[in-house]
């Protein structure tokens, strides 16, 4: 029974995206402790400043999976590219308890859960990209199998204005946490537009 409860807690932990976005919002504009190292100060809003802000926020998020991320940025053009390692379907539980406490086989849902998780994570990475520097106007997010240099699963492009008026609202009102997207990740992707 403890294993079933643990699986259910895990599934619930994969639906806290609005809380993660709130954390990103609180971190936005915070001082960057890595901008000065050994007395050398990086340019505010420069490559080093933006990249260290991005990675600091990513590393401080409390996600159910460790996520390796790489980022490239060109502050002069406002472009950012992010690649992250998406979890594998085998990392999701094979069974969760139903309303009667009996284990329900969910092996067939793992691929959908993985896709929905990766899409939500891609949107959160874009949110972080826009939060670390107001000069970032476009974020391309690439989900890869397992590691940032793994096989490409998908790539999404976000621009600041559209993100603010569509995807950011999904975080703000909690819609992105809705379990309906777990059974139909394509519906979540459509909600980003």
Give, region by region, the residue ranges found by the protein language model.
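Long, charge-dense low-complexity segments
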Residues: 1-193
């Amino acid at each position: 029974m403890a294993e079933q409860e643990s699986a259910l807690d895990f599934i619930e932990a994969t639906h806290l995206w609005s809380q993660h976005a709130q954390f990103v919002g609180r971190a936005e504009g915070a001082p960057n402790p890595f901008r000065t190292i050994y007395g050398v100060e990086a340019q505010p809003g420069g490559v080093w400043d933006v990249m260290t802000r991005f990675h600091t926020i990513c590393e401080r998020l409390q996600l159910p999976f460790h996520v390796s991320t790489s980022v490239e940025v060109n502050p002069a053009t406002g472009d950012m590219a992010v690649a992250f390692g998406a979890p594998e379907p085998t990392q999701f539980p094979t069974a969760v308890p139903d309303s009667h406490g009996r284990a329900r086989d969910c092996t067939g849902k793992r691929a959908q859960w993985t896709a929905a998780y990766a899409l939500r994570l891609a949107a959160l990475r874009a949110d972080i990209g826009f939060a670390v520097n107001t000069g970032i106007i476009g974020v391309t997010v690439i989900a890869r199998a397992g590691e940032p240099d793994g096989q490409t699963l998908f790539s999404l492009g976000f621009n600041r204005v559209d993100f603010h008026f569509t995807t950011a609202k999904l975080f703000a009102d909690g819609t992105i946490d809705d379990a309906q997207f777990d059974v139909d990740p394509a519906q979540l992707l459509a909600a980003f537009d």
